[in-house]
Design a protein with these regions (language model features):
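Non-heme Fe(II) oxygenase catalytic core, chiefly the N-lobe of the double-stranded beta-helix
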Residues: 2-176
């Protein structure tokens, strides 16, 4: 049975509806405290020594008490704050990309169930400039092409409640 999505039929109040002048500079900013950082670095060592497929990782399989508390704060910002959160920050300088991605997967999974990022079912999608030219069959997120403001995964019959991004490398230019 296909469920029809309902269109918004009411105003959204602050803090979810805002303009840049409404927000303090630190809006949505959540600092990764030392306890959570320690849990993540300890888990990074475990995952490096015992490689597992990222998609098989579940937060409840690990002792991540401090990280679960941190992610509850993130969820609070998403649901009752400005609607976004920026975690400052994973210690990427100490992590291999695969391990950082695994930690990101686990943290995001504490908020909600991950969903496919593309029509072909990719659960993790790498946004990077591949040098391809935009056009038919080439997603703009693998090119240098600028994009309009958009909502990721809006094509999904059951779109996600949250979208999460892990920035491994800051772009030389562009972005926010």
């Amino acid at each position: 049975t296909l469920v029809m999505l309902k269109f918004l039929d009411h105003d959204i109040p602050l803090p979810q509806a805002w303009t840049v002048t409404d927000l303090p500079d630190a809006a949505g900013l959540i600092t990764l405290d030392e306890n959570c950082r320690g849990e993540l670095l300890e888990l990074a060592d475990v995952l490096t020594s015992n490689p597992l497929p990222i998609l098989s990782l579940r937060p409840d399989d690990f002792d991540l008490t401090c990280c679960k508390s941190l992610m509850a704060s993130v969820e609070e910002q998403l649901d009752r704050g400005p609607g976004f959160a920026i975690i400052d920050r994973l210690p990427l300088e100490l992590l291999e990309t695969h391990t950082a991605t695994a930690l990101y997967w686990l943290l995001a999974s504490m908020i909600d169930r991950p969903v496919a990022q593309s029509w072909d079912g990719k659960m993790l999608y790498d946004v990077r400039d591949t040098g391809k030219q935009p056009g038919n069959g080439v997603r703009p997120d693998i090119t240098r092409a600028s994009q309009n403001l958009h909502t990721d995964n809006s094509y999904n019959l059951c779109p996600p409640d949250y979208v999460a991004l892990l920035c491994i490398n800051t772009a030389m230019k562009g972005g926010v």
